[in-house]
């Protein structure tokens, strides 16, 4: 019988990306791969879009909140149902292990796997743990972290960032679509790429729409998340979503304007790509992006600009400062030791799974 592994994680693209890096490696080595998530969640969309040989198991999901809400009462029942469904799935499949990338949907599968005696491995990308992973940690065999955790947690392994990027632009796949974009861009202007992520693109979209004069100063690439904004015109390329074109666009950009999600930040670090961070504030998140942005700025990897301060004047000042000190930023990023290859993490995870199975 083939070995089986369960993956879980969802809610945002960041809670799926690492899973999509690891899954093909397990499949290549003959593992049977299953995924537990929300059928209406981005995890289901991404798994289907990937075309990977993965069996998806849908469960009920409820949001975990730190504050009082009447919705909590309904969600308690959803989480309980999700736990029962997860127990059934894990008991039926009898996997060798479960790997979780976090998000609210991941808690019931993690608890179920632990209750049924299966090794549980979880990953935390942010400077501080979210509520879902704080709960999941109690049931985990091992937690891998991108950042060093300030608390002394016995089950934590500080890994660094696992990212799959091309540092060399010559390694990028050729794209006729990219060549078409270049036809509308000026070689005399710097190229800026705006990436807002699944939760934060709106502010960038509005900023670019409100300031058409940006096109006179820069070539603009804007990943919008909104197909109604799609446009290719002089010095402007707006597209709702990219997959194969994502890294070529990153390589094409002289500077990236991004939110503070750790996955994107560490991709930029791995590419030594100049970037400005405009993190989501506490009104739109739990404050993790503010922590990530401050960490990157203190390390000398990037500059940050708070969302309320995102005016044309402040933006132009930030651009001028970043380009003036570009060599310093790039040298600091190139010297980093915070990046790990997918192969390194896969080998580590496989070894830890084997050790956990032997210890049972």
UniProtKB/Swiss-Prot annotation:
Pathway: Cell wall biogenesis; peptidoglycan biosynthesis
UniProt function note: Cell wall formation. Catalyzes the transfer of a GlcNAc subunit on undecaprenyl-pyrophosphoryl-MurNAc-pentapeptide (lipid intermediate I) to form undecaprenyl-pyrophosphoryl-MurNAc-(pentapeptide)GlcNAc (lipid intermediate II).
Membrane topology field: Peripheral membrane protein
Gene3D superfamilies membership: Glycogen Phosphorylase B (3.40.50.2000)
InterPro entries assigned to the protein according to its UniProt record, in alphabetical order: GlcNAc_MurG (IPR006009), Glyco_trans_28_C (IPR007235), GlycoTrans_28_N (IPR004276)
Record's catalysed reaction(s): Mur2Ac(oyl-L-Ala-gamma-D-Glu-L-Lys-D-Ala-D-Ala)-di-trans,octa-cis-undecaprenyl diphosphate + UDP-N-acetyl-alpha-D-glucosamine = beta-D-GlcNAc-(1->4)-Mur2Ac(oyl-L-Ala-gamma-D-Glu-L-Lys-D-Ala-D-Ala)-di-trans,octa-cis-undecaprenyl diphosphate + UDP + H(+)
Any Pfam family: Glyco_transf_28
A GO molecular-function descriptor: undecaprenyldiphospho-muramoylpentapeptide beta-N-acetylglucosaminyltransferase activity
Name by which UniProt lists this protein: UDP-N-acetylglucosamine--N-acetylmuramyl-(pentapeptide) pyrophosphoryl-undecaprenol N-acetylglucosamine transferase
């Amino acid at each position: 019988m083939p070995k089986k592994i369960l993956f879980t994680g969802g809610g945002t693209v960041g809670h799926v990306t690492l899973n999509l890096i690891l899954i093909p490696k397990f499949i290549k080595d003959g593992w049977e791969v299953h995924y537990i998530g929300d059928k209406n969640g981005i995890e289901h969309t991404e798994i289907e879009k990937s075309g990977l040989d993965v069996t998806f198991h849908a469960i009920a999901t409820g949001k975990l909140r730190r504050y009082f809400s009447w919705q909590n009462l309904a969600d308690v029942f959803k989480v309980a149902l999700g736990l029962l469904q997860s127990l059934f799935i894990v008991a039926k499949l009898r996997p060798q292990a479960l790997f979780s990338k976090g998000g609210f949907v991941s808690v019931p599968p993690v608890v179920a796997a632990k209750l049924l005696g299966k090794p549980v491995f979880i990953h935390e990308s942010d400077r501080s743990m979210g509520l879902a992973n704080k709960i999941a940690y109690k049931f985990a065999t091992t937690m891998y972290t991108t950042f060093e955790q300030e608390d002394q947690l016995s089950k934590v392994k500080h890994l660094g960032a696992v990212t799959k990027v091309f540092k060399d632009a010559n390694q990028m796949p050729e794209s006729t679509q990219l060549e078409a974009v270049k036809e509308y861009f000026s070689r005399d202007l710097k190229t800026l790429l705006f990436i807002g992520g699944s939760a934060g693109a709106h502010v960038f979209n509005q900023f670019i729409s409100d300031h058409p004069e940006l096109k006179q100063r820069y070539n603009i690439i804007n990943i919008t998340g909104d197909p109604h904004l799609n446009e290719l015109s002089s010095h402007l390329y707006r597209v709702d979503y990219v997959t194969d074109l994502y890294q070529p666009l990153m390589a094409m950009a002289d500077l990236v304007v991004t939110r503070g999600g750790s996955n994107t930040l560490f991709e930029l670090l791995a590419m030594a790509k100049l970037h400005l961070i405009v993190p989501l504030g506490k009104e739109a998140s739990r404050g993790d992006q503010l922590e990530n942005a401050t960490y990157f700025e203190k390390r000398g990897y990037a500059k940050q600009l708070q969302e309320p301060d995102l005016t044309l004047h402040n933006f132009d000042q930030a651009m001028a400062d970043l380009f003036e000190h570009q060599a310093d930023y790039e040298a600091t990023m190139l010297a980093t030791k915070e990046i790990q290859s997918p192969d390194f993490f896969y080998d580590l995870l496989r070894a830890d799974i084997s050790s956990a199975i032997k210890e049972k």
